[in-house]
Amino acid sequence: MSDPAYDNQAPQEQPQQQAPEGQAVPVYEQPEAETPQAPVASESVAAQPALSEQEALYEAPELETPAQAASDNEWQDEDVSNFRPVPRVAIQAFCESESVANTIDYASRDRRMAKAHLKVQLGGVNAAVEFYQTATTPNLILVESRLIGEELMTELAKLADVCDEGTNVVVIGFKNDVALYRDLISRGVAEYLVAPISMGDIMGVITTLFVDPDSAPLGNTIAFIGSKGGVGSSTIAHNVAWAISSNYESDVVLADLDLAFGTANIDFDRDPAQGVAEAVFSSDRIDETFLDRLLEKCTDHLSLLAAPSTLDREYDFDADDFTQLLDVAQKGTPNVIVDLPHIWTGWVRKTLASADKVVITATPDLASLRNTKNLIDTLAELRPNDGKPYLVLNQCDVPKRPEISIEEFTQPLDMQPSIIIPFDPALFGLASNNGQMISETDSKSEIAATFDTFAQILTDRREIEAPSKKTMGSILSKLSRKKSK
């Protein structure tokens, strides 16, 4: 069963102006042996036989002829002119034919895809399975396959085994079969496209998945709060944001909501002219475009919404003042890290209640235990249908300081800490003074590995494992006696 366009063979009787049929080939193919132009995509790909399928990143050629440029404009006007910009999502495509690879790469060049990170690689489902054995999966995987029936389902089952939660899979095949389509959708495939495909097909499926106003928000909001001042909640939030963005190449917006005393700009060695203050004081103007102007780019995948950290005005807010800001951020970014100050106001309470996940940072002392217990109980009332917050025990094993043991600390909370971070003033002090994260200062340290583990936990890339427990003298009875007074 052969399809000339799908096999990357240009139909002899069809001129290039028929490209609106959705065929990528006429845009990229060159007449054989007519002009000494630079090698096209098929030649550049063939010149890389030493690379394995998952390593062979596809590089499409630039437009070189007026005919190609005209065809490009034709596609853009007909297929994608009405599409909205795609948010900050990671997309990888595994293609068996150059025609499909060309089309997807062409779509990635469109201005509406400027925020997305799209990579095209040669190889089909098998290449994707092999690649993701040792790599995390993006927001969307596009796979091309000539298989049908049980053979296709078997290959997709292997792919499902290596996919992280929340990853969408779109299959590009060659058989126009309603039964096949229904079978794929019933097995969790987001969409099935029949080749030959157009740039409009690719843009359409991406915008349906991530831009559709009726679809679920793209990102998860993770709110960090300390059980008391000075426990290191901001430091934890900043390092986790760094770990998610660098380890998984997943876009992160870090919002420092401690407008008066926030430290995110210092920790990342940035001095943005605007940030969260402009957003919250102009909440009626907040949209994706306005938010983009306020973000300070720290890395390719990490953007900072910094606090002004000045005392030239009072920062009194209503309960709903941050709602619009966080809603807009969540619609356009896979991960929104919210660094909350240690205060208890209407807007902090509402932010915690509406967050997808909450992280409480505490130190092993009585005040932290009491406040952590109060926070957990309050969150249970505010979020009755959500899981418990994540607990981070920080600054443990301070020399000569009596501490509550991990076992005694967690017993009244009825939960285990997700991670335990030891007291290391030299490492944290050096990182802070240099405007770096822990993994930048000492990537081989156990603490850097701990932040990597927590990033995996918060992004649902592994099961939560309880850290080892330590035993020390019990002083929990002191807290009980104080409560009884």
Which residues are covered by each model-predicted region?
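Beta-strand-loop-alpha "switch" segments that mediate conformational coupling across diverse proteins
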Residues: 87, 396-397, 410-438, 451
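Conserved phosphotransfer microenvironments
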Residues: 124-132, 137-160
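C-terminal output helix
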Residues: 197-205
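Walker A/P-loop phosphate-binding motif and the immediately C-terminal alpha-helix
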Residues: 220-266
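Phosphate-binding loop that captures ATP/GTP phosphates
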Residues: 247-304
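C-terminal boundary of histidine-terminating zinc-finger modules
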Residues: 276, 434-449
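Phosphate-binding/switch loop-helix module in NTP-utilizing enzymes
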Residues: 306-348
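Inter-motif core of Ras-like GTPase G domains
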Residues: 328, 345-365
